[in-house]
């Protein structure tokens, strides 16, 4: 969507309001009784928050399962303002909206394994997005935006800027010369921004087969 995902959210909110709905933000909900009476509720929260808010309205067994959910790793993310597009050596990457930076398969496996072991990898697997490739309106004329993140052990507050930029530079020499501004967020920043992102976990829990089937 032109303008980014916020444009999609704005369109959905606009449609809801046309149908008579209301949207309220910036309000902490501690218990389900604080919400308007309804026949059903949809939660987009952590499982522990859902268990706390719904309280006795949930069966004890189910509530205990919600509170037992294992949270996954966190992330360290950098948002960039760039003077030029990312100078990827691979021409296909210059046209892609998303680029996963990992080097060899062995490197990727090692990076993710180390993260699960509580180690900050020297060569992290980095996920990047370059929105202005397809939507120039996301930045001032002639400029670009770019973001990149890597997985880190849950709750990590280590600054991973150098490791991430070193990885991008491997495949896009001169990248650092394009950086005008950067903003970083670690696990603590994410949880402060949204308490549902426990330990910086942005996917809502470990996605292994045991948890997916229980």
For each predicted feature, which ranges?
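Conserved FAD/dinucleotide-binding core of flavoprotein oxidoreductases
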Residues: 48-52, 81, 140-167
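Helical element adjacent to the flavin cofactor pocket in flavoenzyme catalytic cores
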Residues: 1-30
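Surface-exposed helix-capping loop/turn segments at secondary-structure junctions
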Residues: 17-23, 88, 158, 169-181
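A glycine-rich dinucleotide-binding beta-alpha-beta segment and adjacent secondary-structure elements
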Residues: 1, 122-127, 174-214
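Generic, well-ordered alpha-helical scaffold segments in large soluble proteins
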Residues: 11, 15-19, 44, 53, ...
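Mid-domain catalytic core of redox enzymes
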Residues: 21, 25-139
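Hydrophobic side chains in beta-strands
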Residues: 80-82, 101, 130, 150, ...
């Amino acid at each position: 969507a032109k303008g980014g995902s916020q444009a999609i959210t704005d369109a959905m909110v606009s449609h809801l309001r046309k149908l008579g709905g209301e949207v309220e933000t910036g309000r902490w909900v501690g218990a389900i009784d604080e919400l308007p009476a309804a026949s059903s509720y949809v939660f987009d929260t952590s499982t522990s928050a859902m268990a706390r808010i719904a309280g006795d309205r949930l069966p004890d067994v189910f509530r205990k399962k919600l509170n037992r959910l294992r949270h996954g790793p966190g992330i360290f993310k950098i948002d960039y303002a760039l003077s030029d597009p990312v100078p990827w050596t691979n021409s296909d990457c210059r046209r892609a909206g998303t680029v996963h930076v990992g080097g060899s398969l062995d490197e990727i496996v090692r990076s993710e394994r180390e993260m699960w072991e509580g180690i900050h990898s020297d060569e992290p697997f980095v996920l990047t997005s370059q929105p202005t490739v397809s939507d120039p309106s996301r930045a001032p004329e002639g400029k670009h935006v770019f973001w990149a993140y890597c997985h880190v052990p849950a709750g990590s507050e280590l600054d991973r800027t150098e490791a991430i930029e070193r990885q991008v530079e491997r495949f896009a020499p001169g990248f650092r010369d394009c950086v005008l501004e950067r903003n970083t967020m670690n696990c603590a920043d994410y949880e402060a921004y949204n308490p549902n992102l426990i330990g910086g976990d942005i996917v809502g829990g470990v996605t292994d087969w045991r948890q997916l089937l229980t």
